Amino acid sequence: MDYLKLDEQLCFPLYVCSKEIIKRYKPFLEQIDLTYTQYIVMMVMWEEKEIQFRDLVNKMYLESNTLSPVLKKLEDKKLIERKKITGNDKNIILSITKKGIELKEEAKLVPMQLGKCLEIKEEDGKTLKEILHRLMQTFN
């Protein structure tokens, strides 16, 4: 086996699939005025309602300097609020706003719309997701 062949790499099909799936999200997310990264942040916010910045960084597998501009745009759109915890300038609490909660209704169609674009059996999708989640756990 030649380990330097592209077809032998695990990372390449993961990279291509990730890129292509995010591309397919784009027209659906444009309808609700979100980028993919903003969308996944909002999914966390819809679930948590309130979360510390450092916990969001860990949950999203992103660096704080990558996440900060995304949060700024969500704040500018009035979807979230950032509050500093008294006595600790580095500890920030993120809260979803009423407008952010209302956006969830519009966003409910996005997963179904995307599902129609992907030619994968439901069972295969579940299996793939389970495998990827196990792989993600090794990164912590």
Please place each PLM-identified region on the residue numbering.
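The N-cap/first-turn positions of alpha helices
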Residues: S18, Y36-Q38, G100
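Short, locally clustered residues in the helix-turn-helix/winged-helix DNA-binding domain
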Residues: Y15, M43-E47, K108
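Pre-recognition alpha-helix immediately N-terminal to the DNA-recognition helix
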Residues: P13, I40-M43, E102
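Charged, amphipathic alpha-helical coiled-coil/dimerization segments
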Residues: K72-E130
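N-terminal helix-turn-helix DNA-binding core of bacterial DNA-binding proteins
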Residues: K23-E63
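Residues within helix-turn-helix
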Residues: F53-R54, N65, K72, I92
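N-terminal leader segment of winged-helix/HTH proteins
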Residues: M1-I32
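Alpha-helical linker/hinge and terminal dimerization helices associated
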Residues: C17, I21-R24, M60, L103-K121, ...
